[in-house]
Swiss-Prot record:
A matching Pfam family: Isochorismatase
Originating gene: isoc1
Stated family: Belongs to the isochorismatase family.
Protein name: Isochorismatase domain-containing protein 1
Amino acid sequence: MAENPVCTAQVNIGSGSQSNSCISILGSNSINSNSVPVLFCFSVFARPSSVPHGSGYELLIQKFLSLYGDQIDMHRKFVVQLFAEEWGQYIDLPKGFIISERCKIRLVPLQIQLTTLGNLTPASTVFFCCDMQERFRPAIKYFGDIISVGQRLLQGARILGIPVIATEQYPKGLGSTVQELDLTGVKLVLPKTKFSMVLPEVEAALAETPGVRSVVLFGVETHVCIQQTALDLIGRGVEVHIVADATSSRSMMDRMFALERLARNGIIITTSEAILLQLVADKDHPKFKEIQNLIKASAPESGLLSKV
């Protein structure tokens, strides 16, 4: 959750009188008869304002947005809490609560759930292929191997009907996606300058793809574009699976520490074969034979996995 707001005001939400500190912070001269003074708290900030008598949850959210709109990521989930004088702490806003007297409330981002089962289904999954470009070939460790595994993943996506989104980092200077990767039928191929793949076009594509809850992510570089993409996605409530045998960096140290950090943040570090077999789940799956043929040739033993 966000840090507890630093507020000096103490308020009484019962029928008694308000404390002097709250009155001095909120002021009383500018409040008309139909307005109720409220101290709105978000993160470490507290801002006094007023709302119409009888305001409920939706109006409170709108007020939070008007006060802190540039700081609130509305892709996150939030809970509105009310300071309860009786308990001396914040409590979740009771169902049906309306503003009837001076009070103090806060907006709290919910913590990302760090424990996830990591189940995958073709209908709820999208593959992200990140910046597998020609100019990176000489610099990225085991680049030829991650291309080979990346192609296996793209073939698997086509077999299972899974959408693929690919990006190219500044293609004018860094070239196009390598020829070994067949991008036939991918949903999007987008140029970018931002390190994260979570561009407006990508967000729109995810929004128009019903039921998506998981992204399988691979490409380069692990500690830059892969890491920033993964963090942006989990911040939006999307489960992320990073394919360890299909992602690399120029430095193995950068790669190792990025994967460790991402795993601590609830991102699943996995392999290409595990992904593909999880997606079919059963030998009686109509596409199992095609996936089996795809994985019969083992993924390259490049040394990447010993560095996870």
